[in-house]
A protein has these predicted regions:
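Phosphate/dinucleotide-binding and metal-coordinating scaffold of catalytic cores
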Residues: 2-179
Length: 179
């Protein structure tokens, strides 16, 4: 019966081993998991054209590799992998390899095509402060976002561009998008 299930699940919910999601008839129970270096809940913020941030969603990694997404507007859904709205943020191509080279501490390998969803989530959550789109995944990336102006490479004159281009080719240019 429902009361028996609720009674059995209550201590698991309180301990965080099981999470109750949804409301009323749409209520479900999911098994959260922790992604190394990221945790078991990952905030996602939206940055508007003026640079103001607002909550967008919270990602909950689930046992089996799925993700539960609780959007700030009340829409929630289960995704078999990383949600579609993070696809454009996934490091890829030349800039993705540059991103991997710039962050060896991630220990993910030099080719983002070989990264799994947890690897991508870790990269986004720790160093995804300057990627395509208006979303920032994770608290660490959001904190880095606030330091972008200090870290950005600036050209004082046209004569600086060759050196900046060389730095970009070597993967040492700060403040470049990885997309």
């Amino acid at each position: 019966s429902q009361p028996t299930v609720s009674r059995v699940l209550k201590p698991l919910i309180q301990s965080g081993q099981v999470r109750k999601v949804g409301a009323a008839r749409a209520q479900r129970y999911v098994l959260p998991r922790s992604v190394p270096g990221v945790g078991s809940q990952v905030p996602v913020v939206r940055v508007d054209a003026q640079g103001c941030a607002s909550p967008f969603a919270r990602l909950v990694p689930l046992v089996g590799g799925a993700f539960w997404v609780e959007e700030a507007d009340g829409v929630s859904a289960r995704h078999d992998g990383l949600p579609w709205f993070l696809d454009d943020m996934r490091p890829q191509g030349f800039m993705g390899r540059t991103f991997a080279h710039a962050h060896p501490e991630l220990q993910l390998g030099s080719d983002p095509r070989n990264w799994n969803d947890d690897d991508v989530l870790r990269a986004l959550a720790l160093f995804g402060d300057d990627l395509p789109g208006n979303l920032i995944v994770g608290e660490a990336a959001f904190q880095r976002f606030h330091t972008l102006p200090q870290r950005a490479s600036r050209a004082d004159s046209a004569a600086d561009y060759p050196q900046l281009a060389q730095q970009a080719m070597q993967g040492t240019l700060g403040g470049a998008s990885a997309g």
